[in-house]
A protein has these predicted regions:
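Charged, low-complexity, helix-prone segments enriched in Lys/Glu/Asp/Gln
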Residues: 21-37, 58, 120, 151-158, ...
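N-terminal leader/targeting segments and the immediate start of mature chains
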Residues: 28-77
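N-terminal type II signal-anchor transmembrane helix
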Residues: 1-30
Length: 195
């Protein structure tokens, strides 16, 4: 009987520890979200003259993605819904999912996923990056980050997604360098923000 009480106590302590760990992760996500949302936004509106000196492919990109007179924004909040594959290519095991993301190019992002039994977040700031997912809301099944390779990957995601959601972040300015590759290709180099 004592062993049963001991095991029950250990199980309760483990569940409490996992719940506290999840709470700490959610607080980190919320603080990061709030910090990204509070970043200053550029002022003014898009004027084609802003890109007149860029290589022709870059200029065409901006003229296609930002209408003249559009307010310049480098942060976007994106709501997603649909299905996510949790299986293999042959048997994708699609599950309903909902997600939300804040993307503040180039400062970082937080992506929060709820796919029923699986949930968690990806994120990046100037100081850190992470991927954290849990089974049943408690049991960690993926927990990586806080290393240079993960950070580079997360920063690449910020830049890639930013080209669709926050093109104003790539207008000429500090940390942005455009160069022509050929008549139909331009390359942008984006400097990561210092912590």
């Amino acid at each position: 009987m004592k062993i049963a009480f001991l095991l029950a106590g250990l199980l309760a302590a483990a569940l409490a520890a996992l719940a506290l760990w999840r709470l700490a992760d959610r607080r980190t996500d919320a603080r990061t979200w709030a910090a990204l949302a509070a970043l200053p936004q550029p002022t003014g509106t898009f004027d084609p003259a802003m890109v007149a000196d860029l290589p022709d492919p870059a200029r065409r990109y901006f003229l296609y993605t930002i209408a003249p007179g559009t307010a310049l924004r480098t942060t976007a909040v994106i709501e997603m819904g649909g299905e996510i594959g949790m299986g293999s290519k042959d048997a994708p095991a699609y599950r309903p999912m909902r997600a939300r993301q804040i993307l503040a190019t180039p400062a970082g992002f937080v992506w929060e996923l709820d796919a029923g039994l699986i949930g968690g977040s990806d994120g990046m700031t100037a100081a850190n990056s992470w991927t954290r997912f849990r089974l049943g809301g408690l049991l960690p099944v993926v927990r990586v980050g806080s290393n240079a390779d993960h950070f580079r990957s997360a920063f690449g995601r910020v830049v890639a997604e930013g080209t669709f959601w926050t093109p104003a972040a790539f207008l000429p300015g500090p940390g942005i360098a455009w160069e022509a590759v050929d008549a139909d290709t331009a390359r942008v180099t984006v400097a990561a923000m210092a912590s």
